[in-house]
Structures are given as C-alpha cells and as structure tokens.
Amino acid sequence: MEYVAAYVMFDKVGKELNERSMTELFNEIGAEIEPETMRLFLSKVSGKSMDEVMSKGKELMASLAISSSQKSEPAQPADTAESTQATENKEEEDEDFDIFAAF
C-alpha cells in the first residue's frame, strides 16, 4: 500500500516516479523498502497515467465484489473426495490472485 501512496503523491506533485525517487522518499520518512516489491510495482505502473491505473483498479475491485457477493448453493450430499478437491481448487485460486497483474 505504501508504494501506491508514493505513486499518488508523486503524481499529485508532478514528480517522476522511479526507483531512485521512491527510495529517497522512503529513506526520508524512515520506511522500509522491499526492493523486489518496489521494482514489480514500478514495472506495472511505468508509463501509465493515474487515470489508467485507477480505472483498471476499479475494474478489478468490481470483479472481486461480484465474485464475493455471489451466494453459494445449499450444501448437497456429495462424495467427500469431490468436495475436498473443489475446496482445494478454490483455495489455490485465491492464493494465485496478484493485484499487480491487473496493471
């Protein structure tokens, strides 16, 4: 979240956001940087306007809201192995979610 906040701050003041400027900002405020995460974030937003990033974020959030608001069907008696496999598949899908992939 701190990388997103830095992105917004740099955009609002019209400064270029890059690895050096973000590192300087984080050092100035005493925040820790995870270099790999920062580089991944910068690679995903590089060359994109704030409007593009916000629009893509809204689309992503809307799709999450739809999938989480869907009601599940009442439980039906089923083979235990099948229901266990379905639960494991759902958990794997949740683990694979990557917010940076949206950009």
UniProtKB/Swiss-Prot annotation:
Query: What highest taxon heads this organism's lineage?
Result: Eukaryota
Report the InterPro entries cross-referenced here. Answer: P1/P2_N_sf (IPR038716), Ribosomal_P1/P2 (IPR027534), Ribosomal_P2 (IPR044076)
Q: Could you name the Gene Ontology cellular component terms for this entry? A: cytosolic large ribosomal subunit
Regions of compositional bias (Acidic residues) in chain numbering: 90-103
Query: Which residues fall in a coiled-coil region?
Result: none
Q: Recite the UniProt keywords alphabetically.
A: Cytoplasm, Ribonucleoprotein, Ribosomal protein
Its subcellular locations are: Cytoplasm
- Which Gene3D superfamilies does UniProt cross-reference here? 1.10.10.1410
Q: What is its main location?
A: cytoplasm
- Gene Ontology molecular function, alphabetical: structural constituent of ribosome
Per the UniProt entry, what is one GO biological process? Answer: cytoplasmic translational elongation
Q: Region (Disordered): which ranges?
A: 64-103
Cross-referenced Pfam families: Ribosomal_60s
**Listed HAMAP family:** Ribosomal_L12_arch
Q: Give a short account of what the protein does.
A: Plays an important role in the elongation step of protein synthesis.
Q: How does it assemble?
A: Component of the large ribosomal subunit.
- Family in the record: Belongs to the eukaryotic ribosomal protein P1/P2 family.
Protein name per UniProt: Large ribosomal subunit protein P2
What organism is recorded for this protein?
Encephalitozoon cuniculi (strain GB-M1)
Q: What is the lineage of its organism?
A: Eukaryota, Fungi, Fungi incertae sedis, Microsporidia, Unikaryonidae
